């Protein structure tokens, strides 16, 4: 008897329907066709053992499994459960006509237990789009999938529960999640606050500007000046995720398999801080079977690269295209996979190998060549893509001893939210543009044209600092953000002056010996 089970394959961060057809033939083996990978082919023994251990009898026939469409690669062990249920349906253990109402996914243990899978959220979204009655999947993934409304999500621990559900012997209660309540519940819970930071008012201001416009920022300072400490507090002043952003962010982490069991919705912006030994594939994504990298896991959030010159230069260079396009395409011989990568880059570095160039009390022991060589590890095109380049000076004793708390993250965040609200109104009719950092050159002429005094100031700066055309655009974007923080309709000379002050590495005299 032919049975058809509905499953899914994840491509990028979206799912595609896969139909698993099962029937019997002469012999005693399992044959799987339809472009399965090694893990799917190995499911034959897992399926056979799981069915027998669950108290059912595996058919003493050849089981032929066809996974269509045949041109889509089926990867991973998540097809164990639908193959097993399809086999039981062909053997009339469960009614085959019931299978058309459900999507079924899950990895099987040899004892029939159902184990966690990757990509449950995009699969659940697909199941709703197909107007299916429900989605049967591992219990560990149930909360994640249940944020999709108008879909019954059944979390199971064992294959026998699926059989009982399909036979109507023991109905399961679907997992129910109030998506909007979950979204609102965890908003604003941050472990770090800017009120803990002593001094560094200029750096706090730079962070405020960066968050208000979604700009990339580089911190340059000696060890112990507070670069990493302040970077950890950056998420606390970013504007909250919208529900659409939260769903998209959760989808990426679902595909990567990085969601913890019981997680429903990611409600705070991601903060990723990979070590400087990271590989290209781990940073931008890829592999034999492409998975999202750190730049995609930081989508709608922050990617913090500490000690930037210590990263492999080739690893840093692969970020250039995603920083511009805010997405990354992983190409293989027969297909391409697209992952979102709209993140805010926050990087830090020492000014020289010893770390003390420009320190007020500790002398630098590096030669001029060593300083220039250290900085040259970061290419000019990459530096051009970093809007704000800030020098971080050590905090003096008086500031450290001051018991007065600094300005709280919440008060800074409110100013950031107000500036973002202006940008949301500005770009409401421009799909894909949400903040000033994403503006095109044409938009700069429309929204960031400075007054006559600002134009003259900008001309002098460009000529003296020998800036690139990209750096010129970055200054205008930052100036527009500064104007938004002041609720100013126009970009004035004072805004241009502050934006130029955030281009430390563009100054021809940065390393003066």
Question: Where on the chain are the PLM-derived regions?
Answer:
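Walker B catalytic acidic pair
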Residues: 300, 306-307, 318
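The Walker A (P-loop) glycine that initiates the GxxxxGKT/S ATP-binding motif of P-loop NTPases
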Residues: 221, 285, 307
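P-loop NTPase nucleotide-binding/switch module
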Residues: 170-209, 213, 240-295
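Peripheral, non-AAA+ core regions of ATP-driven protein-machinery
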Residues: 1-218, 222-228, 331, 471-472, ...
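Residues immediately C-terminal
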Residues: 110, 303-304, 310-311
């Amino acid at each position: 008897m032919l049975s058809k089970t509905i499953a899914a394959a994840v491509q990028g961060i979206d799912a595609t329907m896969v139909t698993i057809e099962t029937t019997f033939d002469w012999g005693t083996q399992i044959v799987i066709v339809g472009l399965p990978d090694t893990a799917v082919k190995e499911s034959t023994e897992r399926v056979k053992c799981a069915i027998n251990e669950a108290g059912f009898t595996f058919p003493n026939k050849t089981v032929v499994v066809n996974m269509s469409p045949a041109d889509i690669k089926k990867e991973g062990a998540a097809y164990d459960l639908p193959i097993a249920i399809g086999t039981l349906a062909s053997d009339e253990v469960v009614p085959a006509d019931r299978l058309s109402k459900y999507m079924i996914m899950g990895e099987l243990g040899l004892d029939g237990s159902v184990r966690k899978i990757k990509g449950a959220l995009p699969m659940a979204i697909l199941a709703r789009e197909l107007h299916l009655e429900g989605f049967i999947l591992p219990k560990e993934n149930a909360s994640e999938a249940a944020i999709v409304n108008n879909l019954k999500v059944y979390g199971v621990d064992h294959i026998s529960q699926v059989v009982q559900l399909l036979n109507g012997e023991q109905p399961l209660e679907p997992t129910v999640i109030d998506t909007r309540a979950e979204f609102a519940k965890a908003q604003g819970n941050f472990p770090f606050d800017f009120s803990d930071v002593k001094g560094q008012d200029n750096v706090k201001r730079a962070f405020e500007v960066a968050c208000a416009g979604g700009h990339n920022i580089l911190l340059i300072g000696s060890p112990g000046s507070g670069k990493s400490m302040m970077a950890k507090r950056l998420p606390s002043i970013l504007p909250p995720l919208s529900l659409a952003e939260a769903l998209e962010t959760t989808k990426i982490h679902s595909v990567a398999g990085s969601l913890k069991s019981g997680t429903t919705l990611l409600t705070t912006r991601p903060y990723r801080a990979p070590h400087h030994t990271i590989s290209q594939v781990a940073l931008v994504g890829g592999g034999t079977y492409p998975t999202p990298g750190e730049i995609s896991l930081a989508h709608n959030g922050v990617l913090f690269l500490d000690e930037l010159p210590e990263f492999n230069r080739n690893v840093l260079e692969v970020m250039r295209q995603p920083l511009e396009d805010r997405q990354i395409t992983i190409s293989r011989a027969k297909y391409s996979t697209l992952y979102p990568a709209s993140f805010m880059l926050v990087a830090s570095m020492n000014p020289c190998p010893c770390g003390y160039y420009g320190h007020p009390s500790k002398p630098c022991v590096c030669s001029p060549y060593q300083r220039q060589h250290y900085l040259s590890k970061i290419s000019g095109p990459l530096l051009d893509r970093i809007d704000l380049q800030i020098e971080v000076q050590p905090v003096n004793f008086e500031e450290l001893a001051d018991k007065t708390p600094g300005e709280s993250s919440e008060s800074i965040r409110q100013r950031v939210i107000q500036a973002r609200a202006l940008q949301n109104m500005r770009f409401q009719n421009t799909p894909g543009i949400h903040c000033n950092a994403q503006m095109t050159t044409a938009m700069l002429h429309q929204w960031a044209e400075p007054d006559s005094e600002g134009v003259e100031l900008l001309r002098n700066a460009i000529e003296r600092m020998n800036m690139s055309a990209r750096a010129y655009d970055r200054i205008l974007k930052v100036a527009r953000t500064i104007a938004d923080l002041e609720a100013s309709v126009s970009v004035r000379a004072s805004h241009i002056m502050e934006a130029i002050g955030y281009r430390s590495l563009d100054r021809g005299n940065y390393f003066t010996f």
